[in-house]
Amino acid sequence: MAGGIEIAFEPLSSRGRGGDVVVFVGDDLALSGPAAEILGRPGAELVVRAAASERFKGKAQSALVLPAPAGVEADRLVVIGLGSEKDRAKTDWTLLGGFTAGKVGGRSARVVLDWPGYAGSARDVADFTLGARLRSYRFDQYKTKKKDEDEAGAALSLLVADPSGAQAAARDAAAVAEGVILARNLVNEPPNVLYPEEYARRVSELTSLGVEIEILDVARMKELGMGALLAVAQGSAREPRVAIMRWNGADDPSEPPLALIGKGVVFDSGGVSIKSAGGMEDMKGDMGGSAAVVGTLHALAARKAKANVVGAIGIVENMPDGNSYRPSDIVTSLSGQTIEVINTDAEGRLVLADVLWHVQATYKPKAMIDLATLTGAIIVALGQDIAGLFSNDDALSAQITAAGEAAGEKVWRMPLIPAFDKAIDSKFADMKNTGGRHGGAATAAAFLKRYVNDVPWAHLDIAGVGMSSTPSEINRSWGAGWGVRLLDRLVREHYER
């Protein structure tokens, strides 16, 4: 599934033979230090001539790939542009790592991480490795003939000023990459493979990292009173599950945790309110929010994060059947609040309602964040490059926004006003599960807010970014694994001690 990229660290003085040599230049095309020494005069002259003929200006995210000249111990020279001095000062190291891995392809390469004015830290180098690992990902185990080999199997030797420091920092980055890759794998799996019981089994594998796992089956959910979640699952031949993951990494195990909640609808046909056939195959990705939670717990446990975090996901399949829940049904949620079903395709909020209520009642978290591919309306509003953020807490909202900006997973805060809450009032129950056509993402968030008590809470609607998102230098996958890097950054900056 993953590309299996190998990354090693060597001092800048290291020299080798064969493979590619990767060097970096600004818009002045200047080579200096170790890069100039490795290329020598023949290599430097070739770069100048080729740049002129190919109109290579050294702009950021541009590259020149050349056969190595005689006298240079390499097969190819890969010259990567960094742009102007201003561009270099704001280098996105994760994207640079992905771009570099893309240019190297499935080859071996010595990458000289040094250039004029270079001031990269071990953390920057670690981010570079994260990007390279994410770029090398592929999901092709169901292909029996042509595999996706073009960027897989690369071996990068990074020549850096502090190999031991970079290697230590890169271990954490590797843990995050594992979490993103796990999330991508889960989203990409077909629903006949990743049905609820199998999903719960895969979550249970996190015990090998020290994560405590509890799986709630149908009997336990009925005992608790999770009527909203169970209603969604009625039409499926596959029983639902709730998977709860606890990572206790803080020095004080009794410290209240951060809670992460995910929607895990492994396939959403729409139920009785069935979706149109066109694009229904994408609904295997309607569990992208839950995948982000599972991937984050993996990353935190793998890097031994000094924080207490609980993750909980509701895993169901929404299918039409003689036993399916129907429009006009009234179901009772775990909170005791009743819900009139208007549209069975607005099922994710019912799943989240019971899980949110259970988590805050059981674990008394210091904050709750839920992630869900919840509404098409958020795609209309924000497209496929940014997630919608709804929150009852300005401080938490600001922290999430900053973490997303730093991690390259951007969010945009959306309004939560009384009018949206009023739109879900029902004539027959405490609320209805849709608020009509207008403001669909906001009325869905208002629905969830009714299941949040006095705790800082944020809802991330990731329908646009969680699946079939815009390709980038670090993602060529249909399932992006969106949210893992944001949440890991959030925990690192605000919840670790």
Curated annotation (Swiss-Prot):
Cofactors (names): Mn(2+)
Sites where the protein binds Mn(2+) 2: K263, D268, D286, E347
Amino-acid positions noted as binding Mn(2+) 1 in the UniProt annotation, renumbered to this chain: D268, D345, E347
Keywords: Aminopeptidase, Cytoplasm, Hydrolase, Manganese, Metal-binding, Protease
Any one Gene Ontology BP term: proteolysis
Keyword Metal-binding applies: yes
Recorded GO CC terms: cytoplasm
Gene3D superfamilies from the UniProt entry: Leucine Aminopeptidase, subunit E, domain 1, Zn peptidases
Keyword field contains Zinc-finger: no
Enzyme class: hydrolase
EC number in record: 3.4.11.1, 3.4.11.10
Cellular compartments annotated: Cytoplasm
SUPFAM superfamilies attached to this UniProt entry: Macro domain-like, Zn-dependent exopeptidases
Leader peptide range in chain numbering: none
Superkingdom classification of source: Bacteria
Cofactor, how bound (note): Binds 2 manganese ions per subunit.
PROSITE patterns linked to this entry: CYTOSOL_AP
Catalyzed reactions per annotation: Release of an N-terminal amino acid, Xaa-|-Yaa-, in which Xaa is preferably Leu, but may be other amino acids including Pro although not Arg or Lys, and Yaa may be Pro. Amino acid amides and methyl esters are also readily hydrolyzed, but rates on arylamides are exceedingly low; Release of an N-terminal amino acid, preferentially leucine, but not glutamic or aspartic acids
Catalytic residues (UniProt): K275, R349
GO MF entries: manganese ion binding; metalloaminopeptidase activity
Stored NCBIfam families: PRK00913.1-4, PRK00913.2-2, PRK00913.2-4
Family: Belongs to the peptidase M17 family.
Function: Presumably involved in the processing and regular turnover of intracellular proteins. Catalyzes the removal of unsubstituted N-terminal amino acids from various peptides.
HAMAP family referenced in this protein's UniProt entry, alphabetically: Cytosol_peptidase_M17 (MF_00181)
Name assigned to this protein: Probable cytosol aminopeptidase
Species of origin: Methylorubrum populi (strain ATCC BAA-705 / NCIMB 13946 / BJ001)
